[in-house]
Amino acid sequence: MSGVGGPALKLGVIGLGRAFGLMLPTFAGDRRVSLVAATDTREAARRRFAADFGGQAYATAEELCADPAVDAIYVATPHQFHAQHALLAARHGKHLLIEKPLALTLEDCAAITEAARAAKVHLVVGHSHSFDAPVQRLRALVASGVYGAVRMINAINYTDYLYRPRRLEELDTAQGGGAVYNQAAHQVDVVRFVAGGEVTSVRAVTGAWDRARPTEGAYAALLTFAGGAFASLTYNGYGHFDSDEWQGWIGEMGQQKLPGTAAPRKVFASQSEEAAFKNARNYGGENYDPGIAAPPVAHNHFGTLLVSCERADLRALPNGVMIYENGVARLDALPPPSVPRSEVIDELYRAVVDGVAPLHDGAWAMATMEIVFAMLRSAREGCDVALSHQVALA
């Protein structure tokens, strides 16, 4: 890790919901960052933040962004508010860590990127699963040239995504809900990172098969890269098959799972009851579980990732990369993480403290979102979609 003995980056948080809860073990375990301020619409979440971290808990994002003690802002609000809050933070000269997706339109993606450039602040978009250590290791193996060029990628994930407790807007594609906005951004980022970044065209189909949850729960897409490689992306969030079975029953967050122990699908009497149930499990809620006491046994993952190079196939696993070459399979093993998702802090810290330009910047995230938008358009219109905002891997 970079700069472990250096000054801690003072972080403010806009939005103490689900995304913050997933990143909290990282923030709590990595001494390169210090949580000093936060805001949320829920008073209970603000009170808990002040009690847990001794930081300032503000009623509004404007007050938080005006705090001179804050070096960087983590934007973890619902997707439809990312642009508003990112632009506000940039105007106050704060460095930015923004949850994926960057924004819900190309225009907003461009506006955020330009605002960060004009304010001379760094912008990192994540966590996305291209930060995962096994994916980073797989990319390093590709970059070594030992196995030749990437020719084909298959990314497959089956989860219960659509039936996890949801707010109403999370079931509305227009407000950033559904599997394409929320899950494809991960898969697209991963395959772009592995294959070099520049995608030329997209063809996709989507599935919305539950009238009670009328947004995309599944998709399949074919991406063609500038160098001739192609990637197939498949995602199903309808909760029948669990592809963690193919990861040795290691869950997405690196946690050990028991086969056949998926939680039964909860039925709610109303959407308001479902939203209340979700809020109660979020940070500051009465049923919140911080998940900090039990460290992960392996790295984060996003399902199967199988990369075909000219001279070998490479498969990312939660504990390393399997290399299949000339009839022999071997594991390039990685030790379990001491701090989950520390790769996000690596990139943010190097940018802000060491002045190293981040990979997952606004231009990179905008290129990822262009593909996500193209997937929705392709599915809607039944056509290939050409791309024009792609950038190569730096």
Regions found by a protein language model. Give the residues of each.
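NAD(P)-dinucleotide binding in Rossmann-like oxidoreductases
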Residues: 211-216, 226-344
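Aromatic/hydrophobic pocket-lining residues that form π-stacking "cages" and hydrophobic walls in ligand
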Residues: 46, 85, 112, 138, ...
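N-terminal Rossmann-like dinucleotide-binding module
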Residues: 1-53
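Short strand-turn motif at the edge of the Rossmann-like AdoMet-binding core
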Residues: 100-101, 127-129, 157, 362
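Beta-loop-alpha module in the N-terminal Rossmann-like domain of NAD(P)-dependent dehydrogenases
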Residues: 17, 23, 55-115
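Short, Asp-centered acidic motifs that coordinate Mg2+ and/or phosphate
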Residues: 37, 72, 152
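C-terminal helix-rich "cap/oligomerization" subdomain common to oxidoreductases
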Residues: 1-6, 72-74, 276-283, 287-298, ...
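Predominantly a Rossmann-like dinucleotide-binding segment in NAD(P)-dependent oxidoreductases
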Residues: 121-122, 129-233, 237-255, 382
